[in-house]
Amino acid sequence: MRSEVRSALVLGALAGLNVLVQRSRLNPDVLVPAGAAALLAGARASGLSSVELGLSRRQSARALPGAAVAAAVTAGAVAAAASLPVASGFRDDSRYADPAAAVRSAFLTIPLSVAVPEELLFRSVLDALLRRHLGDVGTTVVQAAAFGLWHALGAASLSHDNAGVAKAVGSVADGRGRTVTTVAGVVLATALAGLGFAVLRRRTDSVLPGIAVHWALNAAAALAGGIPRRRRASRATTW
């Protein structure tokens, strides 16, 4: 089967998986990892090597120290940004209303159901297939665009979940325009993140650093989301 056809099939599979995740009643925390495992198995069966996929032992061993440093720097940067007064609204996120939920998300849900499977889907399987016929630049652009669109269906609720996003979007749009603005902003932001993850994939020749940074970015944001409520709870119980 031609590489172009296989790439198109994987892009179609990603679109189908995304619809299932966002519109079905199936558990996304199980569905996304299962989908990633299935596509990875299919990629290996089609002839892609572990080196092409960025998953060989040698690649991972060489990338591990850098991945650890990158994760630490990312988490520190998010923590520093979250501590700024201007970011207070963005920390107020209803998805992490329960501090225990924020911790669970940071150390269980995000690594296992977000960072690892998404990096396998986009920077391993899709990346390896696209590089066979598009080259580095074309591959980077296509997978970044696909990564941005992956987040489109789930983006609409963000203006309701996050106080900072709601305020920012509300200052430029109202009604249906709020939803359109939120979705467009999320797609653009995640596409840019996809570009960054792709560059990391090229520079390190491994998927591991992308997984580490992806996890650190989302986990630190989740933990920061519980800060306002932890502080309010502390004040409420102080006599």
Locations of regions flagged by a protein language model:
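Alpha-helical transmembrane segments in multi-pass membrane proteins
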Residues: 2-50, 61-68, 105
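Transmembrane helix-loop-helix hairpins at the membrane interface
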Residues: 104-239
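Structural signal for membrane-spanning alpha-helices in multi-pass inner-membrane proteins
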Residues: 14-22, 39-47, 77-82, 151, ...
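Membrane-active amphipathic alpha-helices enriched in small hydrophobic residues
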Residues: 13, 37-42, 68, 72, ...
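Transmembrane helix-loop junctions in multipass membrane proteins, especially transporters and channels
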Residues: 23-26, 48-51, 82-94, 155-163, ...
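Charged, low-complexity N-terminal segments of organelle-associated membrane proteins
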Residues: 1, 5-23, 111, 115, ...
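Juxtamembrane helix-loop-helix connectors linking adjacent transmembrane helices
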Residues: 50-115, 127, 131-132, 166-176
